[in-house]
Amino acid sequence: MQVNKTRKFLRTLSIQNEPIIVGCSGGPDSMCLLRLLYDEGYKIICAHIDHSIREESVDERIFVEEYCRNLGIIFEPLKLEKKSENEFYYRKKRYNFYKKLADKYDTPYIATAHHGDDLIETVLMRLTRGSNLKGYTGFKKFIKKKNMFL
């Protein structure tokens, strides 16, 4: 993540008085985004999802929860049962959780962090599924999905 570029972008937004749901796994990208938004004065709701896939997931939840508590950030966890190896199953559960939190906190804003490897993985998945040229583009800054901005 290019921290200065991201910080500059965040300062162009006029939503600092609005709550923002931040998808946070506990990895370096989402922790950096969480901290940047905190430093810029955003009202953050940290959405942490334990997919129950890796043994370390409990430790990651505890780490993120303690980090949020120390900064006074609202922490909203979700623990999923491992039911599928299908990426789409977990994506649907993830976005349903974000939607539930967006409704609870009356905000359309959801932020997630991604890095170059995520983009490569996404493009490769789209290639194997026979996507059109639009599927090979990079991540967009904003995606409007129903009444939410991701």
Set out the residue ranges of the language-model regions:
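Core alpha/beta nucleotide-donor-binding catalytic domains of modification enzymes
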Residues: M1-L150
